[in-house]
Regions:
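Membrane-proximal intracellular helices of multi-pass ion channels
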Residues: 1-432
Length: 432
């Protein structure tokens, strides 16, 4: 086994780690101590729940609060945490906790998993990731407890608060409130809405950005280009989405803000999406497709990819050099962003086609929304998830898996190159 892992690429190790965690999680959820008395849990639903948790999505075919015991809910929370931080990061944390050293291969896997430029200082960075996560989740749980303790006994309110904080920071829209209600009962609670929004926002900008904000003490001029891009795009998408939802939907500003934030990979809902207008759902599909930022707990094609696409289009249209925030943008960045976007659209198109084939009675709007939500690891739904057939559930699982790993990681699993030794003449293609 050890020799096999040494021969495997970092991408394959990461992919195998996520797949193994999903199947182990499904087995744990099938244990009698995980399921409430009188509940007949099918394996496909346990597998779906595990995949949704590990891929930090939040789509569910069974209600977490009504189906699983406290132990089962704990398993789901652990799977969310593993999925959010990444299997490689959690493995590294265990290795460091027992006093072992991480070898060179392990550092390469961690570098790729965390989207880092190099493996230098990787151990220190992993430690900061765990400390940052613990800090945000504990503070989030304490603040959420203030709200939940009004409606539940203290011990149960504590459990709900911890689960909610873990789910929110890891951009996974799970809840244990029961009856598939998510946070609809708290849509007018401004305090809980803002706490949840902040947990989602910081979980979605990435650990590199959080570290830089702290180290450089909020001084904009000292931030790297990556941090400036992530913060600019995150704020722009959040504000833009809130304005659109305020205009297209019948909801107050706090509801519009919450839906704008949660659409970018979190998946909590305070309003029924089945009642949204087509314009509102279209805006939400776009936000779900873009998703969070690199190195974060969220999915989607990432905010930096959208920024690179905008810059590339601007450069091509104006025939000027690629630059932003007083930095020069490498041409390869636009090519990589284009590949990610095209692959993302292609995956969603195939998934939507398959869902329409398996579920002929579902409107294409709902099918497109469901598959974009799965690919973006969001967890929002127009209400069709619980009624999906087994084939549709498996399709959704594959979509969540691809979305969590990322299109490029999936592509590299089958990509081999020995280098091109033959040189060909340049060709020209008419574009546009």
């Amino acid at each position: 086994m050890r020799k096999l892992l040494k021969r495997m690429s970092p991408a394959r190790i990461i992919a195998l780690g996520f797949a193994a965690t999903i199947f182990i999680g499904s087995g744990l959820l099938m244990l009698p101590c995980s399921v409430r008395n009188g509940v007949d849990l099918k394996y496909i639903d346990a597998l779906y729940t595990s995949a949704s948790a590990v891929c930090v999505t939040g789509l569910v075919t069974v209600d977490i609060g009504d189906t699983f015991t406290a132990f089962g809910q704990f398993v789901v929370a652990v799977l969310i945490q593993i999925g959010g931080l990444g299997v490689a990061s959690m493995g590294a944390g265990v290795i460091l906790a027992v006093g072992k050293r991480i070898n060179l291969k392990g550092r390469r896997v961690l570098r790729d998993a965390m989207n880092l430029d190099s493996g230098k200082g990787i151990v220190k960075f992993i430690k900061s990731v765990f400390l940052t996560t613990a800090a945000f989740e504990l503070v989030g749980a304490a603040l959420s407890f203030i709200v939940f303790v009004r409606d539940y006994p203290p011990l149960k309110a504590l459990g709900i608060s911890l689960f909610h904080s873990v789910a929110a920071f890891n951009n996974s829209g799970f809840d244990i409130l029961g009856n598939f209600q998510s946070l609809s009962a708290y849509k007018e609670d401004v305090f809980l809405n803002l706490v949840t929004c902040l947990l989602i926002f910081f979980g979605g900008i990435g650990f590199l950005v959080i570290r830089e904000i702290v180290e450089k003490r909020f001084r904009w001029r000292r931030f790297s280009m990556h941090t400036k891009v992530v913060l600019t795009m995150s704020v722009a998408l959040t504000v833009g989405g809130a304005v659109i939802f305020r205009i297209t939907e019948d909801m107050p500003w706090i509801g519009a803000l919450f839906n704008s934030v949660t659409a970018r990979t979190a998946g909590f809902s305070t309003y029924s999406l089945s009642e949204f207008s087509n314009a509102g759902l279209l805006a939400m599909i776009f936000l779900m497709f873009v998703g969070a930022s690199p190195g974060s707990t969220g999915g989607g094609i990432k905010t930096s990819t959208l920024f690179a696409l905008i810059q590339g289009i601007k450069t091509a249209a104006t025939n000027t050099s690629e630059k932003a925030f007083h930095y020069s943008v490498p041409r390869g960045v636009f090519r990589k962003a284009s590949v990610i976007a095209v692959m993302g659209i292609s995956v969603i198109a195939v998934g939507t086609f398959m869902l329409c084939a398996f579920e002929p009675d579902i409107a294409i709007r709902d099918a497109l929304f469901e598959m974009t939500s799965a690919f973006g690891t969001v967890g929002l739904t127009t209400g069709i998830t619980t009624g999906l057939c087994t084939a549709s559930k498996l399709t959704s699982i594959v979509m969540m898996y691809i979305g969590r790993l990322g299109p490029l990681t999936i592509a590299t699993l089958w990509y081999f190159t020995n280098g091109d030794r033959i040189k060909y003449p340049d060709g020209n293609i008419a574009i546009g």
